[in-house]
Amino acid sequence: MSPDLLGALLVAAGYLAGSIPFGVVLGRLVLGVDVRTVGSGNIGATNVARAGGKKMGVLVLVLDAAKAIVPILVARRVLAGTPHAEVWVTAVAVAAFVGHLFPVWLGFKGGKGVATGLGIFAVLAPWAALAGLVGYAVAYGLTRISSVGSLTGTTLCAAGGFATYGPRHPISWAGLAIALLIFLRHRENIRRLVRGEEKKV
């Protein structure tokens, strides 16, 4: 099998892995509810925490990050030493992220991508991920508003990716695209923030 065909298959697998809606699955199996019908209606960790407590929220956060981490690590191992390996690995990361946002299992209606994006940065740019976590903690600690923490952390992750790899590397641009998509998925949160109506968690 050619490296490019293998890379394409790994991208498809990354998308399918990213599409696994852990928030919905655990909500139904453990909490007995469809998290899409409670709170904000989002399938991510914050809304799961609203429905089932902080431990459930943390579990979903870890699993949503892992569904990007695992495909990236597999792609790195399988494609090691092949031409364009870094490009394909980056493509697998983006595919997992897109899978979370537009999961085939849920009619392409998914989450906002913060945890999955964090998983991507944790593997591809660990220092950027650390900066993002610190930024989230500080912003959330000051405001008690999850979206403020998420958007602050996302911005620092993307900036950290550029600082790590420079403007010519595919990971830098993938990180920027991921950040922009996260901001787009938070557009309603941003509107509520502007109006002073965003709820604290």
Swiss-Prot record:
Its EC number is 2.3.1.275. The chain crosses the membrane at residues 5-25, 55-75, 88-108, 118-138, 164-184. One of its GO terms (molecular function) is acyl-phosphate glycerol-3-phosphate acyltransferase activity. Keywords: Cell inner membrane, Cell membrane, Lipid biosynthesis, Lipid metabolism, Membrane, Phospholipid biosynthesis, Phospholipid metabolism, Transferase, Transmembrane, Transmembrane helix. GO terms for biological process: phospholipid biosynthetic process. Pathway: Lipid metabolism; phospholipid metabolism. GO terms for cellular component: plasma membrane. SMART domains: G3P_acyltransf. It is a multi-pass membrane protein. Probably interacts with PlsX. PANTHER family: GLYCEROL-3-PHOSPHATE ACYLTRANSFERASE-RELATED, INNER MEMBRANE PROTEIN YGIH. HAMAP family: PlsY. This is Glycerol-3-phosphate acyltransferase.
